[in-house]
């Protein structure tokens, strides 16, 4: 799955963004058109259209702002969640306040890898999800628009 996600991001272009290795993804809501990322200390929650996934912890970035993390993804989430969560890999790169990412989902039912993205989101921007709402992170009871937090 990593090979797909890395190849998808390579086509996006962009230059490397020097930063300290071990920097973490800024906490808060990252929004775009039909894509959203909500980063907390305990989980990174991602939406692409009417699908969503959860990736454990807060994403650690390398010196160029790149990352890859494994988690679980629901391919049929709205209007009614159908099917199991499936193994997935979220990979991407942060340059400034912009995150470009791709997701490779191992569809264990259809026995194929499903690619989502690339998607681009900006820190602090409200996601424009159209007909598909941004759902709550498991256990989250407060507003979904989390103030951005820059930390190194």
Q: Would you name each region that the model predicts?
A:
Residues 20-37, 103, 127-151:
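Tryptophan-anchored aromatic micro-motifs
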Residues 69-91:
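An anionic, turn-rich surface loop/hairpin at beta-sheet edges
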Residues 15, 53, 70, 135-138:
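General secretory precursor processing signal
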Residues 33-75:
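N-terminal glycine/threonine-rich, aromatic-flanked beta-hairpin/loop signature
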Residues 10, 48, 130-134:
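Extracellular secreted precursors and ectodomains with disulfide-bonded cysteine-rich loops/domains
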Residues 6-25:
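Bacterial Sec-dependent N-terminal signal peptides
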Residues 85-131:
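Surface-exposed, polar helix/loop patches in the mature regions of secreted/periplasmic/lumenal proteins
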């Amino acid at each position: 799955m990593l090979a797909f996600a890395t190849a998808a991001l390579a086509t996006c272009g962009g230059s490397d963004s020097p930063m300290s290795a071990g920097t973490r993804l800024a906490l808060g809501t990252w929004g775009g058109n039909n894509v959203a990322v909500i980063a907390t200390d305990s989980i990174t929650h991602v939406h692409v259209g009417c699908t969503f996934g959860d990736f454990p912890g807060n994403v650690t970035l390398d010196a160029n702002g790149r990352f890859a993390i494994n988690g679980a993804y629901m391919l049929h989430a709205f209007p009614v969640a159908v099917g199991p969560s499936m193994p997935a890999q979220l990979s991407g790169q942060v340059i400034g306040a912009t995150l470009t990412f791709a997701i490779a989902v191992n569809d264990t039912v259809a026995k194929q890898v499903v690619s989502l993205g690339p998607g681009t989101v900006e820190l602090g921007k409200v996601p424009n999800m159209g007909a598909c709402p941004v759902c709550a992170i498991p256990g989250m009871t407060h507003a979904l628009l989390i103030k951005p937090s820059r930390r190194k």
